[in-house]
Structures are given as C-alpha cells and as structure tokens.
C-alpha cells in the first residue's frame, strides 16, 4: 500500500514546518477500513460528478474490493478524503464503458492502467492535488512496468491532462453518462 505525506498550501512553497500535512495512500484492504474508504470515495464521486457519471456506492465498493491498490487517495490530517484517482489494469488498449461497471475486468498483470475517475473535493480544488496524485499514479504505473495509462475526459479537461503528458487520441468509443469523451493516453514503455 502506498503511503506518503506532502505539505500543502502557501506554506509548502515557503518551506515552513507549520503547513498542514496531506497523506497519499491507496485504499485499505481490511474489510472494515475498506468499507470506510469506499463510503468516502462514493460520497466524493457524488459531489464531483452528475448522477449519470458518478459511480454508485455499490460500484465503488466492488471496484475497491477488486483492486484496492489502484485507488489512490489524498486525505488531510483528520482523515478527510480530498482527492481520489481510481481504475483497473487491463491488457485492452482502450477504455470501454463496461470497465466502469465490471470491476472483474481488472487484470493485476495488465499492461495498461485505466483511469476511471479523478475527483477533488470542491473546497480543495485549485491546490494542485489532482496533479500531485496523478503524478504519483504515473510513477507507480512506471515502477510496475506497465505500458502506460489511459483515461477519458470531456473537452474542457484535455489541456489539463496534456500538461501531464497525456496525448489526445480524439473522441473515444465511450459514451459513459451519455456524453462524448476524449481518450487520452500516456505511453511509458
């Protein structure tokens, strides 16, 4: 399980020691702790995405039970979930709609890390947390020797992911939530 700490806010830039500390970790695997992580993740999804795009609490719990090590979380010192990135690994090159609902598509030896969701609590947005967590996910994917990462996003986020090295491959076959999505790929190998 990944567990790292990082300072936040202006104090981080100034290098002071009184800055709040955030913890980056993967989801826990003990049943009671995982249920708590899943509930927090489902609540964050519900806040950050419209109902037709947000994963249900049941789907989040099933995903987490199947691939807890592929749920990356940033939480504050009090344990409040601020940012979440999650998705399965697979040998499929492209992200498909069925991956959103079928956690069993996860293959621990898969060549590609799919990203199904990136969510940051509204009060924590604009602090670079999603960028930091995605960089952690990218490095973890590299360390595990995978070919790369794939995600889909709406038009307004193409530039954000491009700044992290993802390449826009055009409109995806995915119509998750009834919307047109761009498929973005970051090839590592």
Regions from the PLM with identified roles:
Residues 143, 155-179:
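Conserved active-site alpha-helix within GNAT-family acetyltransferase domains
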